[in-house]
Amino acid sequence: MTILVPAMLDETFELLKAAFASKDVKVVLLKNSVGVINSGLEFVHNDLCCPCAIMVGQLVNALRSGRYDVRDTAFLCAQAGDSCRGSNYIPLIRKAVKKAGFDIPVLSLNFFDMEQGARFDITPAFLLKALAAVMYSDLLMILKNQIRPYELHKGQTDELCRVWHKRLRADIFKGTGLICYKSNFVRICRDFASIEKTHEKKVRVGFVGELYMKYCSIGNHSLLRHYEERGAEVRVNGFSWYVLYYIDSHLYDFSPVITAGYKIASRIIEGVQKLMIRTLRKYGFECFDSFTPFKRKVQSRIPCRCTTGDGWLIGAEIVNHALSGTKGVACLQPFGCMPNHVCGHGLYSSIQRRLSDTGVRLVSVDFDSSGSEVNIYNRAEMLLTPMIINNKKGEKI
């Protein structure tokens, strides 16, 4: 069987697809981007958040391409299980696929026993492989974002990422990804630290916001690359912080036995996260604190009670970016995403007042299915251009 997975987490899915794969299952990460929004809007309403239109467009275009045997193909989509509209994508995707003239299973990846009969089977072996994929991809993303803007030989960072992706996918597929994670962390950091860099002084921008827009280049019109080409270094926090936020905010309301299991899982994940952070810092790279001190640091500055969608994690990442010296933060969200408008927009002015001594500037960038790339870049320039001007003047950035 072939399982099609939509673009969502650029770095994470490159490794996570090895966790889903088996001898009988081939996993294909959809990367088609041309015309996907228009194709998606044929089958979903434009009032829906744009990640849904992109996912539907990717799937329909892939099925129309003829590259996949529709008799032996399925589509996999994650569900958070809260009141975010993303939890309702699956019935919309099924309806769209049927309307497009195809009949393939649409599977759900969730931890709430939703979609019984069409739920991806989550096993302990899969979880261990997935943990390895998440931690390695976080490490590679953090390293790449801190080195690529300064590399002396263009393309060297991306090439090293491809080399490590290939090695790590093989380890994860075999189930040995976590066995040698300590030595792998060291080898990866050492390899990236050896890349020759310039000594330029560049502005530093943080990305926060809704999961899809923050991590998916198709969703955010390759905004990270655009910023790098304009002379900025972009910092994006790792996905493992979201995983721990999700456990902390969504999975503690079960029976005592299940809750205890999730707490153990949380401690294991954060233990690996701490080791990754120590290794990064040992080789001179920067990273947020592990989840527990990361959360503790922000509790006096933002409310940590809103847990729908990306919830309080958005504000927490803004605060941590500001406290780490980042002077500009781009807040990315789909237009009409209520959880992000409440937890994001609703906190921006308060955060800027509370952190006025840091000089951090926030700019909200909304993505809409009918919006143009030019409008997105113009909005993003409201944050970047003043920072570049100040940088040329020699002011602290």
Region spans (language model):
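An N-terminal assembly and electron-transfer interface module characteristic of large anaerobic redox
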Residues: 1-397
